[in-house]
């Protein structure tokens, strides 16, 4: 974890042409209202957002005063984008694929079906130009988005019946946002948009037949095992989900360089922390749900996965046709995925396959 004095020293040493002095560090108070799509104390995403807001204040030694509003406390969970774009609040903590209706290219900056893992996405956004494309998509709305949380590879979802073939998806009401929901539509299912705080109650009530959320660690605290018996893997829809801090662009550009660096550092720290949390806990919580709650973990068959991919190819082409910008984002994303994924297959997956074979790991 970055200590504040170490952080200031690093910024002072690494910012060309920018001289920090004690008066510069003692600038006037900056107020920062952060609205969120997550309920207060919501395990995983909600606690991450609250921790991140507090960390910004801590790194600034109390000068950037953050006030955090959970979903529904200031605006609804899906209203945070407009709240920040209008300037009523300075930032939101959410997932940018929720704004697919505003511009479909937003989805590439959370996760897309058959897309990048979190490690690949981090390289794309951080090194290979993905952040510049993200800025280009968000700028017309008056938004600047920064990575601020990672889910890791996700499970396929919770189902109240077995999925033995693609026919079992027909008529299924499933909570799945983003382009993954569009893929389900191609297979005859009915995707449903629900904010996180309403997933459990709708699954218990039978209003929906299935839902995706994240992975075992986050899903356990949602108590989804109480509402559905079958837990399928792997998820085709979000191979590496990323959360974000969306900032009012004008407000962001009016900040000093040091204040921008403080916010960026807090985001980078939280982005890594959430990924570490899920990697550290997913295996243990999956075992707990199987052992203590009788959850049946099932793998999607190759035939079902083939249909997911067939549906995705149709959705991808439709999405590309939206605009020149969407086409450019899509084509750049998947061109870079060929390179990044090629190495993942040889390096990460090649090694882990051999390790798991020899050590008997996996299901």
Spell out what each predicted region is.
Residues 2-20, 25-121, 131-363:
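N-terminal secretory/targeting leader peptides
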Residues 126-129:
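Long, well-ordered early-domain segments
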């Amino acid at each position: 974890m970055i200590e504040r004095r170490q952080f200031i020293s690093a910024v002072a040493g690494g910012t060309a042409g920018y001289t920090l002095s004690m008066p510069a560090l003692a600038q006037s108070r900056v107020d920062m209202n952060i609205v969120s799509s997550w309920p207060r104390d919501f395990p995983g995403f909600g606690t991450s957002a609250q921790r991140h807001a507090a960390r910004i204040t801590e790194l600034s030694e109390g000068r950037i005063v953050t006030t955090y509003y959970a979903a529904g406390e200031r605006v609804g969970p899906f209203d945070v984008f407009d709240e920040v774009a209008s300037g009523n609040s300075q930032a939101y903590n959410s997932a940018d694929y929720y704004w697919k209706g505003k511009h479909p290219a937003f989805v590439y900056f959370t996760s897309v079906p058959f897309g990048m893992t979190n490690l690949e996405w981090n390289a794309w956004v951080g090194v290979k130009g993905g952040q510049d494309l993200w800025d280009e998509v968000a700028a017309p709305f008056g938004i600047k988005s920064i990575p601020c949380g990672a889910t890791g590879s996700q499970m396929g979802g919770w189902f109240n019946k077995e999925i033995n073939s693609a026919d079992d998806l027909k008529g299924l009401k499933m909570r799945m946002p983003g382009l993954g929901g569009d893929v389900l539509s191609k297979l005859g299912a009915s995707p449903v948009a629900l904010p996180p705080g309403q997933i459990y109650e709708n699954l218990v009530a039978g209003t929906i037949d299935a839902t995706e959320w994240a992975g075992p660690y986050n899903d356990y605290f949602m108590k989804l095992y109480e509402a559905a018996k079958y837990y399928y893997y792997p998820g085709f829809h979000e191979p590496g989900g990323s959360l974000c801090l969306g900032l009012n662009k004008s407000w962001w550009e009016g900040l000093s360089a040091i204040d921008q660096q403080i916010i960026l550092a807090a985001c980078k720290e939280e982005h890594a922390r959430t990924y570490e949390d899920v990697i550290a806990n997913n295996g243990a919580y999956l075992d707990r749900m199987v052992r203590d709650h009788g959850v049946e973990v099932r793998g999607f068959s190759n035939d079902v996965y083939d249909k997911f991919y067939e549906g995705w190819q149709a959705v991808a082409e439709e999405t590309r046709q939206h605009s020149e910008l969407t086409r450019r984002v899509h084509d750049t994303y998947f061109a870079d995925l060929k390179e990044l994924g090629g190495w993942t297959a040889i390096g990460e997956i090649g090694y882990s396959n051999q390790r798991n074979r020899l050590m008997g790991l996996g299901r």
